[in-house]
Each structure stands twice: as structure tokens, then as C-alpha cells.
UniProtKB/Swiss-Prot annotation:
Its EC number is 2.4.1.-. Keywords: Glycosyltransferase, Transferase. Pfam families: EryCIII-like_C (PF06722). The gene is ydhE. CDD domains: GT1_Gtf-like. This is Uncharacterized UDP-glucosyltransferase YdhE. GO terms for molecular function: hexosyltransferase activity; UDP-glycosyltransferase activity. It is an enzyme of class 2 (transferase). Transmembrane segments: none annotated. Signal peptide: none annotated. It comes from the Bacteria. Belongs to the UDP-glycosyltransferase family.
Length: 395
């Protein structure tokens, strides 16, 4: 029986894509150990993992990523979390012999692989990036304005080297961990410029395990209705103005409008919505998408994949991170209509939804991507490739 150690970045868009493969490892009889935070413990245990917890600095530290200080704070969280994880790994490795480590692009993955000196498999929750995309990041040594570390960061990195004998090659490693194999939760068809990536990249498509969550959402109200579903994900702040635009745009819509407002939205700042609107902080997204005719989204990879899975055409309003790249790819494949967050108004929103509902090319484009997901490498083949890697390494 193999023993796998899984590491991840503690955010929805990173943890959720790994649930399928975590369950696959467990179902195959692997002993699965997953290092994460309290927030994700239950769902990881439901997928068959033994969970070991570290501090959730990401949720408890306010970060403004747009500012130089925000980027420094983000790096500091990575370094401190890596130290926490390395200590857990050091303790676990006294009694457990791990065969390989499976880790996210973000975080401590390569550090732990180097510390344990075992095979490493990386996991990409979004598209793969070419080197030219990484060079734009302030964390890259060749970026125009590389990030200056403060004394606290220098001291923490020195402590890492001294205590665990490992150090990042450069700061970009915290956002681009590589493995001897790289698992990608999309298809070669959807991946931009996919011919640049070799056979070490395993395109397995996204997985959609049923989430064990109870909700009082009135899903039956969506049956036999035209449905617009609107969500800006779980991370964005100050979404109230946008949701008010949606209320203006779709007050006359002949069907249901569902807004997943998120935990951060202040619902008292929203206008009085007509009766055909359902607005809630939390919405069971998979169930709602199953009934939806169009999905207005920020373009986060998780949400986009879920929309594709149910063949729901997309109106995409990207904000940051990988969202502009995802939006551009959807546009290239005629699967999404892209609108600018800086120019959006009620008229533009209404036009976008009318266009997507009226023009069949969007549904056809989405279905083509969905088909490519179904044709991805299956879990059995992924396991075989990992087994082969371990055998090679142990020769």
C-alpha cells in the first residue's frame, strides 16, 4: 500500500479541485495524509484523507495584493505557512514513510519534496503558465521591479534553511511549484497554447464530487423556468454595487434570477429586488447551475469548470489572477461573452445575457469544452504514471 502526502494552498479554488483525486487515492487503498486548515477538514476527511492542521494565516491576515506591501504580506504568509508545514512533515516522517508528495502550484510543495527526498507530483488548479507570464510577477527575479524582502522575511528564510535544510530557488517557487509529473484539472483543448506542454503534464479534467452540505435553498422554484445565475466567487469585496446593477438590468426578466452574494456582501446595501430574484449569501452552485440558462461569473477556474460541466453559456467579468486568461480562452472558443468590470452598466449586462441566450454558438462552444473534459486521462492512468515515477526513483 502506498502512502501519499498531499499539500495545498488553503483556498476554495485550490482545495476543491483536489477532492476527486484525493478520493481516487483513498479508493485505491492508498494511505492519504493531507495537510490543510480547519476550514477544509470535514470535506477532506469525507474524501478519505487523514487531515493534519496548520494555522490559517491566509484567512486571518488582511492583504491588499495590489500594493507592494500587500505582495510582501502574501509572501510572508507563504514563508510562515511553509515553516508550519515543514514542522508537521518533520514530525509525521518520524513514524510514516511517504512514497510521494502531491502538492499545489502554490505553497510549500517543492520544499517538502526536497526535505523528504521523495518523488513530487504538482497539481495545477488553473491553466499552466509559460515562463513569460511568470516574469511579469514582482516575485520573479527578472521582473522589472523585483520585490525587496524585509528583515523578517530574510530571518524566516534563514531559519528554514538552518532548521530543515531547504530553501526556495526563488520567490516565484511559492506560486509555481513544479513536479516530475504535473497534474492539470483541465483538458488539453481548453489549455491555452497546450502544445508547449509535454507528456509530463497530465490533463485529467475537473472533478465534481457531491458536496455533503445541507442547504435550505428553494431549488424547486427554478424548475421549468429560464434562469440567470450570478456569482462573483467567494473572495471579491465590495460587490454590492454590481449586484444592484444586476437588479436594475434583470428586473423585467421573464424567469428567475439567482444571486450568490457571498459571505462578505452587505445585503442591506442591496436595492429592493422583484419577486423573481433569489438573493442569498450562500447558494448550492452545482444544483443551481444544473437548472441555469446563463451564468454571469468573475471567471474563476472552479466556477467556469462547473458552468462548463452543465453546458451553461457564460458571461464573464474577469477581475484579477488567472481570470482574464480564462475569459480570453472562453472568448477564443466561442464559449463565453466577456465584459469589462470597468465599463459595466445595466444596459451592457442586459445585452450580454440577451446575446448569450439568443446565439447558439455559445452553447455549442461550451459543449465542445465539456466533451473535451470527458475525453481526459482517467484516474487509473494517472495512478499508473505515478507508480511508474516511484519505480524509476527507487531504482
Amino acid at each position: 500500500m502506498k502512502t501519499v502526502l498531499i499539500l495545498n494552498f488553503p483556498a476554495e479554488g485550490h482545495v476543491n479541485p483536489t477532492l476527486g483525486i484525493t478520493k481516487a487515492f483513498s479508493d485505491k487503498g492508498y494511505d492519504v495524509h493531507y495537510i490543510s486548515t480547519e476550514k477544509y477538514k470535514k470535506r477532506l476527511e469525507a474524501a478519505g484523507a487523514t487531515v493534519h492542521l496548520h494555522r490559517d494565516l491566509l484567512r486571518t491576515t488582511p492583504i491588499h495584493v495590489g500594493s507592494p506591501n500587500g505582495i510582501l504580506d502574501f509572501v510572508k504568509i507563504h514563508i510562515k505557512t511553509s515553516l508550519d508545514i515543514l514542522q508537521i512533515v518533520k514530525d509525521l516522517s518520524k513514524s510514516i514513510q511517504f512514497d510521494f508528495v502531491y502538492y499545489d502550484k502554490f505553497g510549500a510543495g517543492e520544499l517538502v519534496r526536497d526535505y523528504l527526498d521523495i518523488p513530487g507530483v504538482s497539481s495545477s488548479a488553473s491553466f499552466l503558465f509559460g515562463e513569460e507570464h511568470l516574469k511579469i510577477l514582482p516575485l520573479h527575479p527578472e521582473s522589472g521591479a523585483p520585490l525587496e524582502l524585509d528583515q523578517e522575511c530574510e530571518d524566516l528564510l534563514a531559519k528554514m534553511k538552518e532548521t530543515y535544510g531547504v530553501a526556495p530557488k526563488n520567490l516565484v517557487q511559492f506560486m509555481n511549484n513544479k513536479g516530475e509529473l504535473n497534474v492539470v484539472y483541465t483538458s488539453r483543448y481548453f489549455q491555452p497554447e497546450s502544445d508547449r506542454f509535454g507528456d509530463e503534464c497530465l490533463f485529467i479534467g475537473p472533478s465534481f464530487p457531491k458536496r455533503a452540505e445541507k442547504t435550505d435553498f428553494p431549488i424547486e422554484q427554478l424548475k421549468d423556468e429560464k434562469v440567470i445565475y450570478i456569482s462573483m466567487g467567494t473572495v471579491l469585496d465590495h460587490t454590492e454595487d454590481f449586484f444592484n446593477l444586476c437588479i436594475d438590468a434583470f428586473s423585467g426578466f421573464n424567469g428567475k434570477v439567482v444571486i450568490a452574494a457571498g459571505e462578505k456582501a452587505d445585503l442591506t446595501k442591496l436595492k429592493q429586488a422583484p419577486e423573481n430574484f433569489i438573493i442569498a449569501p450562500y447558494v448550492p452552485q452545482l444544483e443551481v447551475l444544473e437548472q441555469s440558462d446563463v451564468f454571469i461569473t468573475h471567471g474563476g477556474m472552479n466556477s467556469v469548470n462547473e458552468g462548463i460541466h452543465f453546458s451553461v453559456p457564460l458571461v464573464v467579468m474577469p477581475h484579477d489572477k488567472d481570470q482574464p486568461m480564462v475569459a480570453q480562452r472562453l472568448s477564443e472558443l466561442h464559449a463565453g461573452y466577456v465584459i469589462s468590470k470597468d465599463e459595466v452598466n445595466a444596459q451592457i449586462l442586459k445585452q450580454a445575457v440577451d446575446e448569450v441566450l439568443r446565439n447558439d454558438q455559445y452553447t455549442a462552444g461550451i459543449k465542445k469544452i465539456n466533451q473535451s473534459f470527458k475525453e481526459c486521462m482517467d484516474m487509473e492512468e494517472v495512478m499508473e504514471r505515478i507508480d511508474e515515477l516511484i519505480r524509476q526513483k527507487n531504482k
